[in-house]
Amino acid sequence: MTEKLWQGRFDQPTNRQVEDYTASIHFDNRLYRYDIEGSIAHCRMLAQCKIISHDDASLIVQGLGEIRRELERGKLHLGSSNEDIHMAIEQELMRKIGEVGGKLHTARSRNDQVALDVRLYMRDTLLQCRGLILQTQKVLVSCAEENLGVVMPGFTHLQHAQPILLSHHLMAYYEMLKRDDERFEQCFHRTNVLPLGSAALAGTTFPIDMEWTAKYLNFPRVTSNSIDAVSDRDYLIEFGAASAMLMMHVSRLAEELILWSSTEFDFIEISDAFCTGSSIMPQKKNPDVPELMRGKTGRVYGNLMALLTLTKALPLAYNRDLQEDKEPVFDTADTIISTLRLLSRLIPEIRFHRERMGEMAIQGFTLATDLADYLVKKGVPFRKAHHIVGQIVQYCLKNRKQLHDCTVEELKTFHKTIDQDVFPFLEVAGAIDQRVSIGGTATTRVVEAIEKARAELDALEQSLSS
């Protein structure tokens, strides 16, 4: 049994079951790069402030560098006998360079050490997520551009509502992801604060320089309250919430891909590379990837609830409960990263059944609103026009007709103002291109939206790369 670095206070060794129960190294070992990065920064600051000698600092930094290289090459395995990754690295450092390694923890607690490690991890994770959102947005915009002339029925209540451009529909998801990126950007801003120097909760008696450490680690600011610094998990909950909303948007798209690929809709075919078959039914081609995207949304929601419940009613400052924040955060990060990677590859491989979508665009009386608008332009109050067109739809249903099948004479029986000039209002192309309001489905507006999105994505890509 490895002796703990904090063993001095205790007469008896820790119960083995307690060691197993409290250990976190099996999941927090992914933080090793950040722990070493933070320790090197802390060590250099201690030397800069003359708290430890430059010779000792050089030895410590060299030892930490060796540990990092050995871990990266798989030559060093920090086993389950270690409590967590932070203590494991410190113990390995002392094994390598002796007692001088014990000077590293001067003016530092595991509380602010862990807080720093997780913030460093989250900075990288948020940037990675934003890059993947950007890639998915690019794919959606390209798909919208390639299918600019394709018409389809727009839906409300999953019933045919009005004809729209497929490109317009796809660009709706671009807007959702745009809001998601904004949330991740704002989360990054609140994550990007240095807590190191807060120590256990009250700060430290040593003359440290938090601003120096912040500059070294590229943090624009430091925390303002040491108690809050070691107990704050808001940024993780924000990440969980932003991720939940992102996955909610992904699940909506996934659901539509599942529906659209069904025999009943037959709007699309998903590439074989993203589907699986049945163990018993030879004909089946199942949209498993979108289904799992829809399903994995639930686990991200669950992780958010775990974080909220974990931090509910916790007294200040640090409590061991907070060890439990890592797994839901790591799982959420892994889930959204893998989901976005797949989604950005799946979308370009979709084959749209353009003719089928066009045929269905006019079904279900999708031009009824346009006929009502026609009557309004003839001077009929909208509510009356709405009622008249409702009667026409009723007539068509009884006679098994579509609106465009009706003659002028038939339509005139419902209102005398209807004439030959009604027919452009009963054509899908005209119905679409008349909707020129900002954000509308008219081709000109959708082209504008695509061009605007391209400019936004170029600017975002430059911002992320810098």
Curated annotation (Swiss-Prot):
<dbReference type="Pfam" id="PF14698">
    <property type="entry name" value="ASL_C2"/>
</dbReference>
<dbReference type="InterPro" id="IPR024083">
    <property type="entry name" value="Fumarase/histidase_N"/>
</dbReference>
<comment type="similarity">
    <text>Belongs to the lyase 1 family. Argininosuccinate lyase subfamily.</text>
</comment>
<dbReference type="GO" id="GO:0006526">
    <property type="term" value="P:L-arginine biosynthetic process"/>
</dbReference>
<keyword id="KW-0028">Amino-acid biosynthesis</keyword>
<dbReference type="InterPro" id="IPR008948">
    <property type="entry name" value="L-Aspartase-like"/>
</dbReference>
<dbReference type="Pfam" id="PF00206">
    <property type="entry name" value="Lyase_1"/>
</dbReference>
<keyword id="KW-0055">Arginine biosynthesis</keyword>
<keyword id="KW-0456">Lyase</keyword>
<dbReference type="GO" id="GO:0005829">
    <property type="term" value="C:cytosol"/>
</dbReference>
<dbReference type="InterPro" id="IPR022761">
    <property type="entry name" value="Fumarate_lyase_N"/>
</dbReference>
<comment type="pathway">
    <text>Amino-acid biosynthesis; L-arginine biosynthesis; L-arginine from L-ornithine and carbamoyl phosphate: step 3/3.</text>
</comment>
<dbReference type="InterPro" id="IPR000362">
    <property type="entry name" value="Fumarate_lyase_fam"/>
</dbReference>
<dbReference type="GO" id="GO:0042450">
    <property type="term" value="P:arginine biosynthetic process via ornithine"/>
</dbReference>
<dbReference type="InterPro" id="IPR029419">
    <property type="entry name" value="Arg_succ_lyase_C"/>
</dbReference>
<dbReference type="GO" id="GO:0004056">
    <property type="term" value="F:argininosuccinate lyase activity"/>
</dbReference>
<dbReference type="InterPro" id="IPR020557">
    <property type="entry name" value="Fumarate_lyase_CS"/>
</dbReference>
<keyword id="KW-0963">Cytoplasm</keyword>
<dbReference type="InterPro" id="IPR009049">
    <property type="entry name" value="Argininosuccinate_lyase"/>
</dbReference>
<protein>
    <recommendedName>
        <fullName>Argininosuccinate lyase</fullName>
        <ecNumber>4.3.2.1</ecNumber>
    </recommendedName>
</protein>
